Amino acid sequence: MASFTIYPAIDMRGGKCVRLLQGDYNKETVYGDSPVAMAEQFAAQGAEWIHMVDLDGAKEGRRVNDRFVIEAANRLSVNVQVGGGIRTEEDVAYYLERGVARVILGSAAISNPTFVKKMLQTYGRRIVIGIDARDGFVATEGWLETSNVKAEELGQMLAEAGAETFIFTDIATDGTLSGPNITAAVRLAEATGKEVIASGGVRSLDDLRALREYAEQGIGGAIVGKALYTNQFTLAEALKAVNER
C-alpha cells in the first residue's frame, strides 16, 4: 500500500505558534510561545515530518521567522519543510544549506514561474509546490489575491517542469475543522500524476482515514494543524489511525 504521511503544522507569526481562520490575519489564535518547543512535542509523539510556515514572511515577501525553522531542523531528528516568504534563490539555498529538508514555493509559482522552474531543475525533490485554491482558482500573496488560473492547470505546468510533490490547500476549509476537500485534492493528483499532500479542514481521525483511502491515487499525506491544537486528537493517535492495516 502507498505510504501516507502526517505533517503536523506549525504556523509562526511574531515568533509564536498561531492558527489563522481561512488565512485571515485578523482571525488569529495563539497556541504557543515557542515554535521549537512545539516541534519538540510533535517529534516526541513520533512525527517524521514537521510543516512550518512563516506567516509574517508570506505577508512581507521575505524571511522573518527563519531562525526557529533552522533551530528545529538542526535540533530534532525530524524532517522539516518550510513555506512562507521564500521568493528568491538565495532564500531557497539559505534553508536547504542549513538542514531544512524541503522548501515550499507557493505564490512564486504564479508571479515568477521561471524562477520556480529553475529551482525545480536545481533542487529537484527538495522543492515542494504549494497550490492554494479558492473555488478552484489559485490564490497568491498570503491568500490576499486570487488569480484566474485553475489549480489543475498550474499543477500540470509545474509537473512538466519537474515538480514531484504538491501541497494542496483549500482555503475555504482551512482552520475551520469542517472536513478536507478530498475531491479537489484527488483532482490535482490525477491531473498531475504526482504526489499531493492535502491541507485544510482535517477535524477527525476519520478524515485522515478517508484521505488515506486515496493513497494509491496519489494522496501522499495530510497537513494537520487546528485539530491538533484544539485537541480533537493527538498526533500519536493520528499516526496510529493512518498506519492501521
Swiss-Prot record:
SUPFAM superfamilies: Ribulose-phoshate binding barrel (SSF51366). It catalyses: 1-(5-phospho-beta-D-ribosyl)-5-[(5-phospho-beta-D-ribosylamino)methylideneamino]imidazole-4-carboxamide = 5-[(5-phospho-1-deoxy-D-ribulos-1-ylimino)methylamino]-1-(5-phospho-beta-D-ribosyl)imidazole-4-carboxamide. It is found in: Cytoplasm. The active site is at residues 11, 132. CDD domains: HisA (cd04732). One of its GO terms (molecular function) is 1-(5-phosphoribosyl)-5-[(5-phosphoribosylamino)methylideneamino]imidazole-4-carboxamide isomerase activity. Keywords: Amino-acid biosynthesis, Cytoplasm, Histidine biosynthesis, Isomerase. GO terms for biological process: L-histidine biosynthetic process; L-tryptophan biosynthetic process. GO terms for cellular component: cytoplasm. InterPro entries: Aldolase_TIM (IPR013785), His_biosynth (IPR006062), HisA_bact_arch (IPR006063), Isoase_HisA-like (IPR044524), Isoase_HisA-like_bact (IPR023016), RibuloseP-bd_barrel (IPR011060). Belongs to the HisA/HisF family. This is 1-(5-phosphoribosyl)-5-[(5-phosphoribosylamino)methylideneamino] imidazole-4-carboxamide isomerase.
